[in-house]
Amino acid sequence: MFKALADPTRRKILDELAERDGQTLFEICSRLTMKYQLGSSRQAISQHLEVLIGAGLVTSHREGRYKFHYIDTGPLQRLTDRWRNRETKEN
C-alpha cells in the first residue's frame, strides 16, 4: 500500500476518485489533464490504476463496455485504526 501511495500521480488519481467516485479511465485521464496538466498516456494511467487496485485502494467493475473505478479507503482506515488501538493500549 505504501508503495502505491508513494507515487504523486497515483495520489492525484485517488484525489480525483475521492472528489468524484465511479469514473472511467477516459474520465480520469481527462480530469487529470484539465486539473493538473498531467500529460500521462491512457496506458500509464491504466497501469497506475492497476497498482492502486493491487494495493486495495481502488476497486473497479464493468458495465457493458465501460469499467468504473472507485476509491476504497478501507485499507487506510484499518491502518489508522491499528495505530489508534495501539496508542490506547499503551495509555
Role assignments for model-derived ranges:
Residues 3-4, 8-41, 66-77:
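N-terminal helix-turn-helix DNA-binding core of bacterial DNA-binding proteins
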Residues 49-50:
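Short, hydrophobic-biased segments on the C-terminal half of alpha helices
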Residues 29-30, 41, 56-57, 80-81, ...:
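Short alpha-helix boundary/capping motifs
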Residues 53-63, 70:
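Beta-hairpin "wing" of winged helix-turn-helix
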Residues 24, 62, 84-88:
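Hydrophobic alpha-helical segments
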Residues 61-67, 79-83:
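Hydrophobic transmembrane alpha-helix bundles
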Residues 73-91:
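Phospho-regulated, low-complexity intrinsically disordered regions of nuclear gene-regulatory
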